[in-house]
């Protein structure tokens, strides 16, 4: 259902963030973000001269290369448009994200490496969203891995706990989604086992 009709208004500022997930030929995954900020009016800038209506105030990129375990193999950032020339000096710091794993504690670890004066607020803000896109991109790859695991199970290998179990309301151990998708991992399965003991 869409939002209700707004009151009469005029657009002043637009932040556009595009997030994309790519599966590479080498099996790794690139998560890429492009952020732009524009105004609907022109204004003078001490460092850039006149910034026209629709001209980017910020035009920034981040690319993270990750493996199937959500480990960041490489990260790079670039700033095409910034309010100050010195802003581009923050982009090399984002290479320090290599070696982090996207998961619990990711945002804290990001802030330790590129927080405050070590990085750029705008580039840092998109990293949490990039983590979400990484999970959305990786899901089909994990599905294929789980399908292979199910084949191995049929041969007698034990099944691993699903990575998404317990990560949100839909994947709560007592949810209908878990009961259908992973019945052996639902709370009902645990209760059945306890009743048999």
Q: Residue locations for each model-derived region?
A:
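Short, Gly/Pro- and small/polar-rich lid/capping loops
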Residues: 1-43
């Amino acid at each position: 259902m869409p939002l209700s009709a707004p009151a009469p208004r005029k657009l002043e500022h637009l932040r556009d963030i595009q997030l994309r997930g790519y599966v590479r030929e080498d099996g790794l995954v690139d998560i890429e973000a492009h952020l732009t900020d524009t105004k609907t009016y022109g204004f003078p800038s001490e460092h850039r001269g006149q910034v026209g209506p629709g001209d980017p105030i910020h035009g920034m990129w981040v690319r993270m290369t990750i493996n199937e375990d959500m480990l960041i193999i490489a990260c790079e950032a670039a700033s095409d448009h910034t309010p100050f020339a010195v802003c581009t000096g923050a982009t090399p710091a984002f290479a320090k994200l290599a070696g982090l794993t996207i998961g619990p504690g990711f945002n804290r670890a990001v802030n330790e490496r590129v927080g405050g004066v070590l990085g750029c607020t705008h580039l840092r803000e998109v990293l949490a969203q990039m983590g979400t896109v990484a999970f959305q991109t990786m899901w089909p790859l994990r599905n294929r891995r789980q399908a292979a695991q199910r084949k191995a199970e049929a041969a007698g290998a034990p099944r691993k706990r699903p990575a998404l179990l317990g990560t949100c309301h839909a994947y709560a151990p007592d949810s209908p989604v878990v009961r259908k998708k992973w019945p052996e991992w639902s709370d009902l399965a645990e209760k059945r086992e306890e009743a048999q003991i």
